[in-house]
């Protein structure tokens, strides 16, 4: 995790977080105490995550502390976040990749990728971003981000770019992966649970089965806009370093000169590939093995690394080695973001936020779209996007019906906004932070991208409503 130095700004952040929390708790503001305490927790954690007065993993325990003192929601819902299935996915993937370090397969994979993709920084950013975007169109974004970040870090360490506090390239590569995994979910209904919430509401509204091709076609303009804007932000971000160490030919020769792959390398690589394949093929066997979810698949294969022996019959991974090299802070940070979402949702703060938006009287269609998109982006940055969809979709439907507007186009626009969160280290954005990315760096770059993407979604959504007669027209069974 990022190193902490007690500068003046950090001391200010240390005091500002709890001070804002107390301010919200003590001043009524016409809101229930539970709602004020939940919103205060959001501000507290946000200040500490960006200002880093303490390690981000420590901040991640604040939902437990606040809920213990104020009883905002059921404590079981908060505590369960720290032992959620996706936490085990991160731990299992981490166990496999530290086995890669011991066997040397990380160098083999890195040299192969560098020989194929090349060492141009912009090319690396584009390839990682597009790979994450396309994969997350069909797969859970946490799985995509965890797998690709692990592989990318192996490559970056190989070319002496593994220290994210010193490297100019590594932060951009990890942002490319996590932003791509975030954006890609919009492309198909399979891109995330938040999309299925939208599908469920559409089926309820129409009284008929939803045809998935409608999603792909009608959300394509916004998907393209989000992808293009985000990629441009990444490529235009100033980076003084234009290439990684070495050349494509150098890495191709290095890869070809490596000794024959050893048994332990094959097994550690196979563990990762099999875990990924079983995760991606989950639909084929989930009826027979309902509890074998991706997190537990990776944990099974990760645990197997303790039993893997090298040619001298010594364990490849010992507990002592794992204890020192596992990214414990990442697990707590990821869980803390989920716990914060549970706190905000369980306290009723999310519903209050959504209702405040619904009360705004608007005559301008484009301003209404802008407010819906902006509100959803802010809320999905704090709570997970599935919870955000569950809370706000009924509000969006109510607003559209109340203003006598077509409902489906506004549902499409709202759905796009659940897939464009970039600033806080919650949800999948905790993964690069766990690898060492500074939360402040993510916040600054993410804020710029959020503003540009919000504007692009607003404009494209408005143009679709105004000039595309088929936007919102569904193929009904």
Task: Please report, for each region that a protein language model flagged, where it lies by residue.
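Hydrophobic transmembrane alpha-helices of multi-pass small-molecule transporters
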Residues: 1-89, 214-355, 448-454, 458-477
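Membrane-embedded alpha-helical segments and adjacent helix-loop junctions characteristic
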Residues: 2, 57-58, 62-164, 323, ...
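C-terminal ends of transmembrane helices
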Residues: 44-51, 98-112, 116, 307-319, ...
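Transmembrane alpha-helix interface/packing and boundary motifs in multi-pass membrane proteins
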Residues: 47-55, 131-141, 178-190, 374-385, ...
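Residues that define the loop-to-transmembrane-helix transition and helix capping
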Residues: 57, 76, 123, 171, ...
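Membrane-core helix-loop-helix motifs of multi-pass transport proteins
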Residues: 159-243, 428-465, 477
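C-terminal transmembrane helix pair
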Residues: 161-162, 220-221, 332-340, 344-345, ...
